[in-house]
Amino acid sequence: LEELATSAVRSGVDARVKCVRDQYLGYISLEDNLFDLSIEDGYRLLHDPRAAEKDVERMISSVVTGLFSACATLGQVPVIRSQRGGAAEMVAKELESRIRDALNQRGNPFEGGARMTPGSSSVQRPLLCLFDRNFDLTAMLQHAWTYQPLVHDVLNMRLNRVDVDTDGS
């Protein structure tokens, strides 16, 4: 912000600047459609059985802050979906709560974008899918909508037959 202010003064356009806000900076924009939360060791911390609950909560809060910042910058209220029973679900619940709180405040960052009011169309809202990194998304993307290619890869299907060992293994 200091560089921006210095450049504005040097260029003589500082009189045109009405307001600069230092908020919603919980992410780093790398490209038009790519951003980074710049969180180190997040995966290790969230999957370490010895991790303190306070550290896990702090990590989840950091992820939520970054995602909220990105949504607020875009001015869009996403439809949030996550897998159940893990860090992704905890992030989804906290993010949903933070967005609801912001929507109930005056001057919220989503006033120009989609609203989360009853009767609003979810078609016009972006979809935010949260997955745990342990979730194997590639199998779903690489295989057709039928189970045959998946069965062929996983269960060694030969001549349209599959032998399944049921001896408890």
Where is each model-derived feature located?
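Extended, well-folded catalytic/binding cores that form a central cleft or groove in large enzyme
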Residues: 1-169
